[in-house]
Amino acid sequence: AEEIIINKKIGEIKHVDAAFSSSLTDLFQGIPLSESNNHTFQPHASTWSDPNKGGGYGWGQLSHMFAGVLKITHLEPDQVFCLSVPSPTNVDYTNAVSMKFSNGATGSFSGSAFVPKDFGGTFYITVHGTLGVLYLDMEVKRERLFVRLNNGDNINYEIEEGDGAFSYGTKEA
């Protein structure tokens, strides 16, 4: 995706939208992550539920999404506005972020902890340019990267299952 954007295949970036959602309402309420019940080492729930420790969806999850957005676009945020829904521990369950970049482009970003357990969540980035649009979808079992150009051309890039949202994890060589 980064190479496509650097090579100006979609032209000058005018807008970016992205969303990241995952099943973490328990953590933001101060309840330990149920998926770690059988693990030898369980993370402290306060890691995600204490506002003084950077808890909440924005710090804990959207940081991953923004790393992806900024990595592939090379844009620099200039102005940012955010609305959120607080949890009982006063950290954010959701985020609705509007952004203006230094090149004049705009961005609309969303994050939510309200996803059913065992779903895996959503992670996508869409980059709108003067020549076309890049779609990068990293939802588990729906991984895809494609470009739709204004001239009618479509370019599809194969992404293997598991090489999307989990691709930044460790794998056996």
Give, region by region, the residue ranges found by the protein language model:
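Active-site donor-binding loop signature of nucleotide-sugar glycosyltransferases
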Residues: 18-20, 111, 129, 159
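A short glycine-threonine-serine/GTX helix/turn-capping micro-motif
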Residues: 53-59, 157-168
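C-terminal helix-rich "cap/oligomerization" subdomain common to oxidoreductases
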Residues: 102, 149-152
